[in-house]
Amino acid sequence: MAPYRLDVVTLAPQAFAPMGELGVIGRAFHAGRAELVLHNPRDHASDRYRKVDDEPYGGGAGMVLKPEPVFAAFDAIPVCGRRRVLLMTPQGHPLQQADLQRWATDHDQLVLLCGHYEGFDERIRTLADEEVSLGDFVLTGGELPAMTIINGVVRLLPGTVGSAESLVEESHSDGLLEHPHYTRPAEFRGMGVPEVLRSGDHGAIARWRQEQREQRTAARRPDLMQRWQQRFGADNDSEHRA
């Protein structure tokens, strides 16, 4: 089976070097489950100074990423199976777990376009199938959002995480936050582990965890709780917990 291919168009390819060395994501790359390929627009610049930015038409602060080197870098990327092109921009839709699951399941290749400088030429948007943001804030470039997406997608690929069950139970997998976790010791500085978790009653443990997920989501993220209730129906809460 061919590895899941991740192509990144970036002016800072060195920023991605640690991804191949750390934790389960690095092991996934070494095991051939995923492949990371970096493309620097500077390698496609047409002048001897490898210039990739210019002043904005109409004036204004900062420099704008030119379209020619970005398009040239993009055109050099082969299409490998079911490809999706994502543009990293604070104007994009906020990244959700459902996006990561969709990209990991429905596609074999992601192309991640990282902006830089004050912004990018508007024509670069035409390359993208989707525009993605980490939230309502601005970073110096699209590299950190791209790394976030790479991490989130690769960990969902079969074999990356040892237990598939852990992917099902974690926060946002079905719209709810994850339940609390405890390990030894049973008592620490006056704080104890809930008795139900030490009871050995798997049914009671499952019910407790689901109750904790719902309570925690309602308290910390009422927006998620509202969406979850609309999806499953408040009348079906007890059935969903069973």
UniProtKB/Swiss-Prot annotation:
Enzyme class: transferase
UniProt xrefs under Gene3D superfamilies: 3.40.1280.10, tRNA(m1g37)methyltransferase, domain 2 (1.10.1270.20)
Catalytic activity: guanosine(37) in tRNA + S-adenosyl-L-methionine = N(1)-methylguanosine(37) in tRNA + S-adenosyl-L-homocysteine + H(+)
Taxonomic superkingdom: Bacteria
GO molecular function: tRNA (guanine(37)-N1)-methyltransferase activity
Positions with a binding annotation for S-adenosyl-L-methionine: G115, L134, G135, D136, F137, V138, L139
SUPFAM superfamilies: alpha/beta knot (SSF75217)
Localization of this protein: Cytoplasm
GO cellular component, one term: cytosol
Compositionally biased tracts (Basic and acidic residues): 210-224
One annotated GO biological process: tRNA N1-guanine methylation
Positions of the UniProt region annotated as Disordered: 210-242
Pfam families: tRNA_m1G_MT
EC number: 2.1.1.228
InterPro entries tied to this protein: Alpha/beta_knot_MTases, tRNA_m1G_MeTrfase_C_sf, tRNA_m1G_MeTrfase_TrmD, tRNA_m1G_MTases_N, tRNA_MeTrfase_TRMD/TRM10
Keywords: Cytoplasm, Methyltransferase, S-adenosyl-L-methionine, Transferase, tRNA processing
PANTHER family in UniProt: TRNA (GUANINE-N(1)-)-METHYLTRANSFERASE (PTHR46417:SF1)
Function noted in UniProt: Specifically methylates guanosine-37 in various tRNAs.
Recorded family membership: Belongs to the RNA methyltransferase TrmD family.
Quaternary structure annotation from Swiss-Prot or TrEMBL: Homodimer.
Descriptive protein name: tRNA (guanine-N(1)-)-methyltransferase
